[in-house]
Design a protein with these regions (language model features):
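Acidic, polar-rich low-complexity tracts and alpha-helical solenoid repeat scaffolds
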Residues: 16-248
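Sec-dependent bacterial lipoprotein signal peptides
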Residues: 1-17
Length: 248
């Protein structure tokens, strides 16, 4: 009996969803109604329905009071549904069209998250495998989005979490550059190595590869016979002694 009731309940719920979708195409469907249905779907984690209602709201009522909040909700739902590219596109569009909106910080946050999650990869997330020797797909974009958020909106409620993610990404991106620099150094290609080492210092300063990069710069300058630059690098090593032994 309980099984029969469960089946009837599921059928009724599906019928209700279908009915709401049918009504969304009715000219009498209003922005508040579409937004309410989207919120109900989000609360029940029915992201497919939420996306449907929010997309209807955006396409049919772009100038309604609910439209802007609907756009923010839509990028969130795309992200939660694993549609990262759609979330990134929605966030980019929102930032471009609403640069002074009071919640534009949230758009940067969602953009960063949508690049960040895929950038870590399944092996790294599940088995803690070091994937820093592989190209960090999405990591640089996530780093840029989170950095923009923290720089432009230091008091944002999303800034603390973004800051923690920046630390992780800074280390990851720097380690990737370090692997390439090591490859060049092993082959005596010191000019190529220096390009990567400079990037670690200039772009990812404070990462756990910073002091190591300075040491490798010193070695490279000496190998190239560039005494003045080697001396400058020695001074930088002294100034950054607090970062010694940070590279694992």
């Amino acid at each position: 009996m309980h099984g029969v009731l469960a089946v009837f309940t599921a059928v009724a719920m599906l019928s209700g969803c279908a009915g709401d979708r049918d009504r969304s195409n009715d000219p009498r469907a209003t922005p508040p109604w579409l937004y309410e249905k989207a919120q109900d779907s989000i609360k029940s984690t029915n992201y497919t329905n939420a996306i449907f209602f929010l997309e209807q709201l955006e396409s049919r009522f772009p100038f309604s009071d609910e439209a802007k909040q609907g756009q923010l909700d839509l990028m969130y739902v795309y992200y939660r549904d694993g549609q990262f590219e759609s979330a990134i596109d929605a966030a980019d569009n929102f930032v471009r069209e609403n640069p002074t909106h009071p919640r534009v910080d949230y758009a940067y946050y969602i953009e960063g998250l949508s690049h960040y999650d895929p950038s870590r990869g399944v092996l790294e997330r599940l088995f803690r495998v070091d994937t820093t020797m592989r190209p960090p797909v999405g990591a640089l974009e996530a780093f840029t989005a989170f950095s923009t958020l923290v720089d432009r909106f230091p008091n944002s409620e999303y800034a603390p979490d973004a800051t923690q993610r920046i630390k992780f990404l800074r280390n990851r991106l720097a380690r990737y550059e370090a692997h390439i620099a090591e490859y060049y150094i092993r082959r005596g290609a010191y000019v190529g190595a220096l390009r990567r080492l400079h990037r670690i210092i200039e772009t990812y300063y404070g990462s756990d590869s910073t002091y190591w990069a300075l040491e490798m710069m010193l070695e490279s300058y000496r190998e190239l016979g560039l005494g003045d630059l080697a001396a400058d690098t020695e001074r930088l090593l002294e100034e950054n002694a607090h970062l010694k032994n940070s590279k694992s």
